[in-house]
Amino acid sequence: MSYLQRLFSGFSTSAQSVGQFQRMLDWKLLRGSHEFPGPDGGTCVNEAALVAAGYPYRAVYSVQDLPASFSRPIAMLALCLNDTVEDEQRQKLLLPFVTRLAGSADNETVEMERARLILESTIRDILIPALVQEKHADLSHLNRLRNRLSSTAELARALHSLSHSFLPRTLTSACEHAYNAMAQLECRRHTEVVFCAFLAMRELAGWEADGAIYERAAGILKQALEIGKQANEEPESMIVKRMREARRRPVPRRRAGRTLQLIS
């Protein structure tokens, strides 16, 4: 593991650690896809990860545009966060993942395990706390399921029943997204699972100030990355060199369009 990877292996988001990492990579993360890097970087997190890993640069319109070495469910959550959070939070939360995406792809069993973790963590750590905060009478059954460590499927079915209750629209929509994610999990569509789980997160993002939901989402992304294969180990000097060279290339640059949607 390179120094850059070790620096954030514990996912420290202190101002000192983030500042040190930003100075090393010197790369600005932006929303959307981009045909070429600019003098400040200026790409999404997945495009920056291409550069860091030494791949030829390409605009990333969907996770299918990434090399096979990128885990699809991991890349999907990174893409969704990249295109949703505000600039300052994007830099803080996602820049540490630039050196951790290439080489993360694993077999289907592992990828499904990652997708399941992302969905279950979304339900347990983000959706259920929001429902508990609402103090709806129908939550007693859901709390019992959570307390006895019920399966993701049981939790999703309970959420589906809650979506027909008299809850605020944001919560009912989030419950539906979680249930849809469970349906995708049963069909073994790991990328679709993550996309639906993220839609549930996004519905709830306005419930807590200062982007707290997305901070939890980045923590879930880190947990998923700890399952299975890890990023390729390379010298930090090589990674920094690649990032610098990409910024120096005299190529025209314009922002390419990308809409946050599921593309299988």
Language model features with spans:
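Short, glycine-biased loop/turn motifs at secondary-structure junctions and
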Residues: 2-264
